[in-house]
């Protein structure tokens, strides 16, 4: 191909492959929401290899301000094409909610200084799983309140009322992430 003035090269010619692409250890990184609960790292590796997009910035701003009690926006629906983008956004938000030390290094200063809460409690549900205690039992278990939800699943599934959810969640900053719900709802 002629690489004269004004002619673009191919993607292969124009880009360099990052060495991380060939690093098989990347499979050890957080790949799904449930890893947020058990991961021992602080999330810095995740953000070192990811670029913060405008969409991520908007989600971080609104979601973290809600956790700080500075926004009334309580639910966020991520409507994106398939391919992991939604899960990626939720993992990123979960890491920032869980690890306050990341916030000053990842977030704009005007946002980070407004976040007056420590580590948020996180419940992360992946609908490709099928827990015996149903989605609400799994969420309550991750929040350390399995005892309060047990009556709603032990003798067969029953809906959990708003008052019980308020008791389970309490006043502590709490982030509940739900991913891949259609497969769960089909079961």
Give the residues covered by each predicted segment:
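Mid-core helix/loop region of P-loop NTP-binding domains shared across ATPases and GTPases
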Residues: 147-182
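Conserved ATPase-coupling elements of RecA-like P-loop NTPase cores
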Residues: 184-187
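Walker A/P-loop-proximal flanking segment of P-loop NTPase domains
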Residues: 2-84
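Extended hydrophobic secondary-structure segments that form protein cores and membrane-embedded regions
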Residues: 76-84, 119-128, 175-180
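Intein modules and their embedded homing endonuclease domains
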Residues: 68-77, 95-102, 122, 136, ...
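Flexible phosphate/Mg2+-sensing switch loops adjacent to catalytic phosphate-binding sites
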Residues: 94-127, 148-160
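Walker A/P-loop
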Residues: 87, 133
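Hydrophobic positions on the alpha1 helix immediately C-terminal to the Walker A/P-loop
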Residues: 89, 93
């Amino acid at each position: 191909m002629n690489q004269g003035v004004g002619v673009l090269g191919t993607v292969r010619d124009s880009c360099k492959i990052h060495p991380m692409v060939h690093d098989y250890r990347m499979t050890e990184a957080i790949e799904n929401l449930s890893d947020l609960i058990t991961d021992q790292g602080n999330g810095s590796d995740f953000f070192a290899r990811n670029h913060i997009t405008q969409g991520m910035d908007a989600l971080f701003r609104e979601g973290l301000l809600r956790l700080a009690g500075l926004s009334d926006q309580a639910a966020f629906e991520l409507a994106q094409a398939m391919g992991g983008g939604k899960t990626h956004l939720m993992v990123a938000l979960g890491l920032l909610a869980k690890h306050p030390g990341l916030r000053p290094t990842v977030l704009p200063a005007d946002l980070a200084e407004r976040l007056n809460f420590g580590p948020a409690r996180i419940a992360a549900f992946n609908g490709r799983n099928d827990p015996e205690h149903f989605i609400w039992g799994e969420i309550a278990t991750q929040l350390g309140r399995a005892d309060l939800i047990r009556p709603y699943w032990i003798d067969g599934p029953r809906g959990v009322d708003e008052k019980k959810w308020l008791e389970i969640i309490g006043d502590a900053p709490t982030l509940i992430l739900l991913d891949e719900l259609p497969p769960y709802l089909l079961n």
